């Protein structure tokens, strides 16, 4: 590890083989916490390359628990988190809309890091069991077309890295990695990041991880979702090619909404917001969910444009199908 840390201190990139070897040693308990701290900090100061991020994701995914399922078209829409926007649980709410629209949603998430309520927190408040075993989770997915995979349980190897992350207390390559190490072989993905400078490189990593189609999105003011309070930027992976795009609310036929009016609260409060959206109660929360679900339909290829995706999201919510998906998950993942 000393040689690797020294190399990072000299701002030199690691090869894929070097990164793979280091991560294998870390996740099998052969590296000290202080060395992991130095390693994560060194990568952050140097800047993480596509090769380093891909190698990390591949090793971590290889150590994840496997979910038995015959479904081969799964999608996820989680973000990196850590944007300090204190918004409600946007992607979690949107996941039920996407599932209601016929997409097989394997929602991967964790407890809160920088907000008051992460996806695991809000779903737990809604009665979802975070601790089912892998076989049971596979059955839930087969029966309902939606499942929540609690990252802490899916990635036992994280226990070797978490103390170092907590002692650092700042975003590292691990924050960028969470959405990339889904236990299932995802076909499509909507991934949010608070770093617009990493849109294209993250899309490259998704391509390396085998995604057929994906959108990596960064909202205004570093929101790790699409937002209605300014310009949203995104990278589209389609047909093996990556392209960069952006839009204002007016470009997609939506009204501008300030960030302040989509603030969330604790898990119980965010659960109430989620329910209100799925019950089609008009609010800034509903509009923000419609936008992100619409982008999700576009990322999946279910719609040919973001505008078409938004229209589909409104239809799915108004029909009650999205709310029905929540009730199904509450019934089967309990």
Swiss-Prot record:
Covalent S-S links between cysteines = none
Asked if Transferase is a keyword of the record, the answer is yes
Keyword match Amino-acid biosynthesis:
yes
Positions annotated to bind Mg(2+) 2:
224-225
UniProt-listed Gene3D superfamilies: Nucleoside phosphorylase/phosphoribosyltransferase catalytic domain, Transferase, Pyrimidine Nucleoside Phosphorylase, Chain C
Q: Name one GO cellular component term.
A: cytosol
Reaction equation(s) it catalyzes: N-(5-phospho-beta-D-ribosyl)anthranilate + diphosphate = 5-phospho-alpha-D-ribose 1-diphosphate + anthranilate
Which molecular function terms from Gene Ontology are attached? anthranilate phosphoribosyltransferase activity; magnesium ion binding
Q: Which cofactor does it need?
A: Mg(2+)
Sequence positions that bind anthranilate 1: 79, 110
> Where does the chain bind Mg(2+) 1?
91, 225
Instruction: Name the Enzyme Commission number(s) assigned to this protein.
Output: 2.4.2.18
The pathway it acts in is: Amino-acid biosynthesis; L-tryptophan biosynthesis; L-tryptophan from chorismate: step 2/5
How are cofactors bound according to the entry's free-text note?
A: Binds 2 magnesium ions per monomer.
Q: What is this protein's function?
A: Catalyzes the transfer of the phosphoribosyl group of 5-phosphorylribose-1-pyrophosphate (PRPP) to anthranilate to yield N-(5'-phosphoribosyl)-anthranilate (PRA).
Checking NCBIfam families in the record gives: trpD
Query: What does the similarity note say?
Result: Belongs to the anthranilate phosphoribosyltransferase family.
Recorded hits in PANTHER family, A to Z, give: ANTHRANILATE PHOSPHORIBOSYLTRANSFERASE (PTHR43285:SF2)
Q: What is said about its interaction partners and assembly?
A: Homodimer.
Q: What is this protein called?
A: Anthranilate phosphoribosyltransferase
- List the source organism: Streptococcus sanguinis (strain SK36)
Q: Which gene encodes it?
A: trpD
């Amino acid at each position: 590890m000393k040689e690797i840390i020294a190399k990072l201190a000299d701002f030199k990139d690691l090869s894929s083989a070097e990164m793979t070897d280091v991560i294998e040693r870390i996740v099998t308990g052969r590296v000290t916490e202080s060395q992991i701290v130095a390693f994560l900090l060194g990568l952050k100061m140097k800047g993480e390359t596509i090769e380093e991020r891909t190698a990390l994701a591949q090793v971590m995914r290889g150590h994840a628990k496997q979910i038995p399922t015959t479904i081969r078209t799964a999608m996820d829409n989680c973000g990196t988190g850590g944007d300090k926007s204190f918004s409600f649980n946007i992607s979690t709410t949107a996941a039920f809309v996407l599932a209601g629209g016929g997409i097989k949603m394997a929602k991967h998430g964790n407890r809160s890091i920088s907000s008051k309520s992460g996806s695991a927190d809000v779903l737990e408040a809604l009665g979802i069991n975070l601790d089912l075993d892998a076989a049971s989770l596979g059955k839930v997915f087969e029966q309902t077309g939606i499942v929540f995979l609690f990252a802490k349980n899916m990635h036992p190897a994280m226990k070797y890295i978490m103390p170092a992350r907590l002692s650092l207390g700042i975003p590292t390559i691990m924050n960028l990695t969470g959405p990339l190490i889904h236990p299932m072989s995802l076909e499509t993905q909507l991934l949010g990041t608070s770093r617009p400078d990493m849109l294209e490189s993250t899309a490259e990593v998704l391509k390396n991880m085998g995604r057929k189609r994906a959108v990596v999105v960064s909202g205004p003011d570093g929101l790790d979702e699409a937002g209605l309070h300014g310009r949203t930027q995104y990278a589209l992976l389609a047909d093996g090619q990556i392209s960069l795009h952006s839009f204002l609310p007016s470009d997609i036929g939506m009204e501008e909404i300030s960030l302040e009016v989509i603030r969330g609260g604790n898990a119980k409060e965010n659960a109430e917001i989620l329910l209100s959206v799925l019950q089609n109660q008009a609010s800034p929360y509903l509009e923000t969910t419609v936008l992100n679900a619409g982008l999700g339909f576009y990322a999946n290829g279910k719609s040919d444009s973001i505008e078409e995706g938004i229209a589909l999201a409104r239809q799915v919510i108004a029909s009650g199908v999205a709310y029905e998906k929540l009730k199904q998950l509450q019934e089967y993942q309990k």
